[in-house]
């Protein structure tokens, strides 16, 4: 029986662990190598008063599985952030970390990669390489169709009750979860995508894939990265005392930064380094 989503797509989610916290990310294959993409707030703590960002820790781990759902052991990379440069977007809540460089292609068309300085293998999984979103699977912002089906990949660690024993948990927090929704709209002024799909703590930085039906065939494209949920704000005023209580809840909508914005950012950083 075939799977609804292509097998390789299940390899894209990356669990990011840093400073006792966790978030989501994914690997993106650019022309020169593979990059870890996530939301900036997954790696950085924001000082709202001074408008400064500080890394949650000096080291971070990236954990990912292969396309085989029976795989027991993930590939875990360790990144020394004192050696590896983290680039943050000046406008969007986006951070990238270059993980490896492409050396040459095998006869089968696979890239032979080499991890850059500061990236080491902490645990070798049943797959010995990272699986990144290829460029030909990236959807441009201008081509995104409102109402199309989407899937959010990530590690929503805020769901469920964390028991002392992993066996007692309803969820396996070491594995990604998928969430299905639709493209609800586009904000052309901000150049962001609005999705009708609940986003929870831990989903930030995760990949969003768009599903398009072409001639009775499903095709999947990388849409962008989840950065936050859109809040539902309700102000309740007491008629007796005149006080106002503000309630903020998850509206079920989320914000996605398009993948071509990320690719443009990578290209600018490469040009600035030369």
Model-identified regions with their sequence ranges:
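C-terminal cap/linker of serine protease catalytic domains
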Residues: 2, 219-274
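Catalytic histidine site
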Residues: 4-78, 96, 100-102, 182-186, ...
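Short, charged beta-turn/beta-strand-edge "cap" motif at the junction between a beta-strand
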Residues: 43, 156-159, 214-215, 230
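Hydrophobic alpha-helical segments and helix pairs
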Residues: 77-132
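Short glycine/Trp-rich loop-beta-loop segment that forms part of the substrate-binding cleft
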Residues: 119-168
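A mid-sequence, solvent-exposed acidic-amphipathic segment
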Residues: 156-202
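Catalytic nucleophile loop of clan PA
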Residues: 197-226
């Amino acid at each position: 029986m075939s799977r609804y989503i292509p097998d390789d797509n299940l390899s894209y989610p990356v669990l990011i662990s840093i400073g006792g916290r966790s978030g989501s990310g994914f690997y993106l294959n650019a022309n020169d190598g593979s990059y870890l993409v996530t939301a900036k707030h997954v790696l950085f703590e924001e000082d709202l008063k001074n408008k400064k960002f500080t890394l949650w820790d000096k080291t971070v781990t990236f954990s990912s599985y292969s396309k085989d759902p029976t795989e027991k052991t993930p590939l875990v990379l360790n990144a020394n952030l004192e050696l590896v440069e983290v680039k943050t977007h000046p406008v969007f809540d986006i951070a990238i970390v270059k993980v490896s460089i492409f050396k040459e292609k095998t006869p089968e068309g696979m890239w032979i990669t080499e991890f850059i300085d500061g990236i080491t293998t902490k645990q070798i999984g049943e797959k010995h390489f990272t699986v990144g979103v290829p460029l030909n699977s990236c959807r441009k912002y201008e081509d995104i169709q409102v109402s199309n089906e989407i899937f959010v990949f990530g590690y929503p660690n805020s769901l469920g009750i964390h028991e002392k024993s992993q066996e007692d948990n309803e969820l396996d927090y070491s594995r990604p979860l998928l969430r299905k929704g639709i493209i609800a709209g586009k904000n052309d002024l901000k150049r962001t995508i609005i999705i009708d799909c609940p986003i929870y703590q831990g989903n930030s930085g995760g990949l969003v894939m768009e599903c398009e039906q072409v001639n009775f065939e499903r095709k999947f494209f990388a849409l962008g990265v989840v950065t936050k949920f859109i809040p539902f704000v309700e102000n309740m005023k007491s008629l007796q005392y005149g006080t106002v209580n503000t309630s903020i809840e998850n509206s079920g909508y989320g914000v996605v930064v398009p993948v071509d914005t990320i690719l443009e950012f990578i290209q600018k950083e490469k040009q600035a380094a030369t």
